[in-house]
Amino acid sequence: MTTSSPVRRAVGILRLAAGLVLAVALVFQIVEKVVNNDMIAEEYFSYFTIQASMVTIVVLLVGGFVALRLPVDTAPYTIARMSVVTYSVVTAVVYNALLRGIPDEGFVVTPWPGEIMHVWITVYLVLDWLFAPGRPALRWTALRIVIIYPLAWVAFTLVRGALTAWYPYPFLEPATGWLSVAAYVVGIAAFIVAVASLAIAYSQWRRPRSEEPMEPERIAQPTAT
């Protein structure tokens, strides 16, 4: 059975390190908010950034072990990886374009965990997608998977907001007008589809000529020697 190349093993170590750094940033922010009596768990864990960061930690740690053991990523893992790349890029753009600079209410958290979650982990994930070896090409059917979680999150957030009068982001507040809310939701959804489409197209463009794009249910098998 073919094992991982030295480059793949280096990629695995980098993924593990990135996952641990993101985990440290998230835990630090949680502990800081708890210590300063600023933690409202049901609100904190309702933020898209926080949920996506937790998923990203799992994907990076799993991907690290996959890269250390296998010469090629599996198709299901690659779809999960493409999804977190998409979510991270969209989160970074939305945060830096719409939310950066908005004053915090109450306790002001230490900034570096937020910078890791909204900037640096995105840079790493994009570079990993562009240059890490062992990524199978994905079919366009993978596109429908990446949009499921964001749509479910929006639906949950709007229903929860209607019941509690709390919304995690200003552009989702009905006080700005439902037309405005709808415009932001549709615009961000379109951006998610666009980013995911670019990621899938890149995976197909960079695949070896002999390799066919993989369906979500197919798993890449190591090559026998």
For the regions a language model picked out, list residue spans one by one.
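Short, highly charged, low-complexity non-transmembrane loops/tails of multi-pass membrane proteins
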Residues: 206-225
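Alpha-helical transmembrane segments of multi-pass membrane proteins
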Residues: 18-34
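N-terminal membrane topogenic signal
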Residues: 2-18
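Non-cytosolic membrane-interface motifs at loop->transmembrane helix junctions
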Residues: 39-47, 76-79, 103-116, 140-143, ...
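Alpha-helical transmembrane segments in multipass membrane proteins, preferentially the mid-helix core
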Residues: 122-138
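Interfacial segments of alpha-helical transmembrane regions
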Residues: 72-86, 142-147
